[in-house]
Amino acid sequence: RLVAVDLLGPSVDPPSGLAVSEESEWERRRITAGIPAMGAELDERTIPAATGVLDRSVSFTKGCYTGQELVARIDSRSAATPTRLVRVKGRLEGEAQLPPVGSNLELEDVQVGRLTSVAAADSGFVALAYVKRAVTLPCEALVRWAEGRDEVALLAD
């Protein structure tokens, strides 16, 4: 389980016993765990059910509570979201650059998604992407970006 906090304050020394990692390492771990981030996967247009966080953060069996009707509606319509957040893993050959955020995911020359976060990982990259719900996972897709570059990547839940 990935647990992390941001420490804000005047001290540059973290409390003893805390592991410190570079922002790039934290980003790689966040993406690998499939955790959406504000400004990348989450914004005012995001449908919460598309992010996959409902299974980890909402109880649909709890007794009566304020907002229960809204939660029940989210549960009954979650399969109706047009996209879902998926993890992407790809290999890069030689000196290849990481695909940028916004790169398209294509299956049989049809765009099925777009990368929202990308990080370097083990001779390749990991990413998160919103993909059309009709796409059967796991599968391989082509990651294509503006410079005419493309790489094959595995899409998984």
PLM regions and their residue ranges:
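Conserved active-site beta-strand-loop modules that form the wall/rim of enzyme catalytic pockets
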Residues: 4-5, 28, 40, 61-63, ...
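Short, conserved active-site entrance elements at the starts or edges of catalytic domains
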Residues: 29-53
